Design a protein with these regions (language model features):
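Flexible loop/hinge segments that line or gate small-molecule binding clefts
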Residues: 1-26, 111, 137-149, 293-334, ...
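Hydrophobic alpha-helical segments within soluble ligand-binding/sensing domains
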Residues: 17-44, 59, 85-94, 113, ...
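An alpha-beta-alpha
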Residues: 30-69, 179-192, 228, 232, ...
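Hydrophobic alpha-helical
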Residues: 43-46, 53-140, 164-165, 187, ...
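Flexible loop/turn connectors
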Residues: 94-201, 434-502
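Intrinsically disordered, low-complexity acidic/proline-/asparagine-rich linker or regulatory tail/stalk regions
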Residues: 196-225, 509-521
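Extracytoplasmic "Venus flytrap"
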Residues: 227-246, 259-269, 277, 281, ...
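Solvent-exposed loop/turn segments at secondary-structure junctions
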Residues: 235-237, 266, 292-294, 315-319, ...
């Protein structure tokens, strides 16, 4: 009898050797990733066939449902026939999206992935803002799309090698290998997926696009001669300046005046005094970033009884939903996940890598979420990486000493996570003092000085907020609150990932100007 083996298929109840991919585990992993990222409706698009591979993919999807304590009746599976025109296939995908209203979609084939992109374009849907995607088969073009696609990656080369080995074993009558052998298949995460954030009080985040003003509301705003006060924790950064510009540009459209802008210099006591001054100005609304969630809470509570409060980044402790209008923030879960994933990808080829975490450590909701999710993605997705040290700096000026002590105590650290750019600059200064510029730095927020360090190779990657967009979003929420009670409680803005070689483009996207000459522009 001529020796033969089955590749990616097998004869049911037969003893013929087969080389397979574990589709059940792969699609369970992809579906679970979306559930863990806050998605409720995850649509699975699969080709309409009778193959065992399709059944395994569906079984993996359904297992993820059960593991997430969901019933099979909540499944969103659409079987799509590929034996029709591309336009008809796209139309059927669009119908499935309209039926299930997913925030995330997984495809079971590479042609389905391409046709899904076509369908989303025709629907005017943005990926990942409106719908996140995990495609199938990590083709070369998957990194070239906008955004680059997350995919279930199959190691075809390994499958061919296993198949060749199994076939030669049979030809040479060697001892039988296992009946089924599996080639590697795993999830590759890029920029086509997003994490759905929750607000400080558990509210699901909505996009700034969910707020709109009618013609009548705009007219009411211009007639109202409204006044707004701004209380910032600190204004001495480009981040704060861009927030202020976004706020000013948006409010000016509706004739709303900014009567004061306060800078607390990260001092809760000073901010409390400034809030007393704001009270005497009797503004129609206040935009604020608390410098400390606990210490400023009572002062903000008192202010909430006389005016509308719209917060940036975080809400003071002991506030309930009736105490403020809305909170606008970068999606901090995604911000941290992006940074953690960059560390993971940087070190993924190391057999065993060690990382240090220099976290904020203060009572600040946004940075706590960010730091925790950076750690979470490393622990769950990169088993070769060990977090050997984790310490909070509390006050920015402490970051230098914390880094100095951490690297001295753990000299085998290969990369550092630092909560945001200003403490990261002090940590880099400590690394230079120790002559340890071999340690890669990853952080959040883009500014001139951190861009300089990225240009010089110290910072390998960062995830940044979109401060101008966030400023416009908070101003729009304020404007809406002056003429309507229909304002979302939590508005999340998607962060922006910056790799070393993408600094020029990122600078233009974030700051709306060309990269300065000093940075290579």
């Amino acid at each position: 009898m001529i020796p033969f083996i089955c590749v990616e298929r097998y004869i049911y109840d037969d003893t013929t050797p087969r080389i397979l991919f574990d589709y059940h585990a792969a699609f369970q992993s992809a579906t679970s990733y979306f559930f863990e990222s806050g998605h409720e409706n995850v649509l699975f698009l699969v080709e309409k066939t009778d193959s065992l591979a399709k059944q395994e993919k569906i079984a993996g999807y359904e297992k993820a449902l059960l593991c997430a304590n969901r019933t099979l009746s909540s499944s969103c599976i659409a079987e799509i026939s590929l034996y029709q025109s591309y336009d008809l296939i796209s139309l059927n995908i669009q119908k499935s999206i309209s039926r299930y209203l997913p925030t995330a979609i997984i495809t079971g084939g590479n042609r389905l992935t391409m046709l899904l992109l076509k369908a989303l374009r025709e629907l005017g849907k943005d990926c990942p803002r409106d719908i996140s995607i995990i495609g199938f088969d990590d083709m070369l073009w998957c990194e070239l799309t906008a955004p680059p696609l997350s995919c279930i990656h199959r190691d075809i080369r390994q499958m061919a090698e296993l198949a060749s080995q199994a076939l030669f074993d049979r030809i040479n009558h060697l001892p039988a290998s296992p009946l089924a052998r599996y080639a590697d298949i795993h999830l590759v995460l890029r920029d086509s997926t997003r994490i759905i954030d929750n607000g400080p009080l558990g509210e699901q985040a909505v996009s700034p696009d969910s707020i709109s003003l009618s013609t009548e509301e705009k007219a009411l705003l211009k007639k109202g001669h409204y006044q707004v006060a701004v209380s910032f924790h600190y204004t001495g950064t480009a981040w704060a300046a861009l927030h202020q510009k976004g706020i000013r540009d948006e409010l000016e459209q509706y004739g709303i005046d900014i009567i004061s802008t306060m800078d607390a210099h990260f001092d809760p006591a000073l901010q409390n005094m400034q809030l007393e001054s704001i009270k005497m100005q009797h503004p129609d609304a206040v935009i604020a970033i608390p410098s400390d969630d606990v210490e400023t809470g009572p002062a903000f509570q008192e202010l909430s009884r006389m005016t509308r409060l719209v917060f940036l980044s975080n809400v003071p402790q002991n506030f309930n939903r009736n105490d403020y209008v809305s909170c606008i923030s970068v999606n901090e879960r995604e911000n941290g996940t992006n940074t953690g994933r960059m560390i993971g990808e940087y070190l993924k080829d190391k057999a065993h890598a060690k990382v240090g975490f220099i976290i904020h450590g203060a009572m600040f909701y946004g940075t706590t979420e960010r730091d925790n999710y950076a750690e979470k993605i490393l622990r769950e997705s990169y088993p070769n990486i060990e977090i050997t040290a984790r310490k909070g700096f509390i006050q920015i000026e402490n970051a230098y000493k914390v880094c100095l002590e951490m690297v001295t105590e753990h000299p085998d650290i290969q990369a550092l996570y630092i909560s945001w750019d200003r403490p990261a600059l002090l940590a880099i200064k400590a690394l230079k003092t120790l002559n340890r510029t071999d340690i890669a730095v990853f952080t959040t927020d883009l500014d001139f000085e951190i861009a300089q360090e990225m240009n010089q190779g110290f910072v390998k990657g960062l995830s940044t907020q979109r401060p101008y967009d966030q400023g416009k979003a908070v101003a729009l929420a304020v404007a809406k609150s002056l003429v309507s009670d229909n304002v979302p409680k939590y508005i999340g803005v998607q962060p922006y990932v910056v790799h070393e070689k993408q600094l020029k483009r990122a600078w233009k996207d974030i700051f709306f100007e060309a990269l300065p000459e000093e940075l290579g522009g």
